[in-house]
């Protein structure tokens, strides 16, 4: 067998129907569009147009707003951190920061920081520097003998810099 001899089985592929190419083709003249009217013309179907009826996107009320100051935080559970420690991706002695979480592959990118959540079990004694932490996460870390310091992440600090002011 050679690459230039490979072909589909007979009848496996069907040629595309070219419309509007003469009456004898079976799809000539109106090309399967019927006769006249808006749908027979080009540039048909105005998106969202419902024939004069009030369209759905205008019948439904506007709702909510986009908060310009909302923080886009990575949510990390204690269980994931314990798995990383067990796998040797996180150093027990070092402080767990946004940068170390990215390096360990727990989060993909820094975004606006990290919120520590208390789902899962933590047995390793770790110290954390995170943007936010839930009460249950702080309790679980302290129960394991570690500590949590909430660091307000500002622009450069989440993007690899080292400017972090403790709150």
Curated annotation (Swiss-Prot):
GO cellular component: cytosolic large ribosomal subunit
Region ranges (Disordered): 1-37
Comp. bias regions, Polar residues: 1-10
Protein keywords: Ribonucleoprotein, Ribosomal protein, RNA-binding, rRNA-binding
S-S bridge residues: none
Ribonucleoprotein keyword on record: yes
Domain of life the protein comes from: Bacteria
Annotated GO MF terms: rRNA binding; structural constituent of ribosome
A UniProt-annotated Pfam family: Ribosomal_L27A
KW Ribosomal protein (keyword) present: yes
Composition skew (Gly residues), residue ranges: 21-35
Coiled-coil spans in chain: none
GO BP of this protein: translation
Family assignment from sequence similarity: Belongs to the universal ribosomal protein uL15 family.
PANTHER family: 50S RIBOSOMAL PROTEIN L15, LARGE RIBOSOMAL SUBUNIT PROTEIN UL15M
Function text: Binds to the 23S rRNA.
Subunit-structure text: Part of the 50S ribosomal subunit.
Name the UniProt record assigns to this protein: Large ribosomal subunit protein uL15
């Amino acid at each position: 067998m050679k690459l230039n001899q490979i072909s589909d089985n007979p009848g496996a592929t069907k040629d595309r129907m070219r419309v509007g190419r003469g009456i004898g083709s079976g799809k000539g003249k109106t090309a399967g569009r019927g006769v006249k009217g808006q749908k027979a013309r080009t540039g048909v179907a105005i998106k969202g147009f419902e024939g004069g009826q009030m369209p759905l996107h205008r019948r439904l009320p506007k709702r909510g707003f986009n908060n310009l100051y909302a923080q886009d935080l990575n949510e990390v559970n204690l269980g994931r951190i314990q798995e990383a420690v067990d796998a040797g991706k996180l150093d027990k002695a070092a402080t767990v920061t946004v940068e170390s979480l990215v390096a360990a592959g727990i989060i993909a990118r820094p975004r606006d920081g990290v919120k520590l959540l208390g789902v899962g079990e933590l047995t390793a004694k770790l110290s954390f520097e995170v943007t936010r932490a839930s009460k249950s996460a702080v309790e679980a870390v302290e129960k394991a003998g570690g500590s949590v310091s909430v660091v307000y992440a500002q622009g450069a600090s989440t993007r690899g810099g080292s400017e972090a002011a403790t709150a």
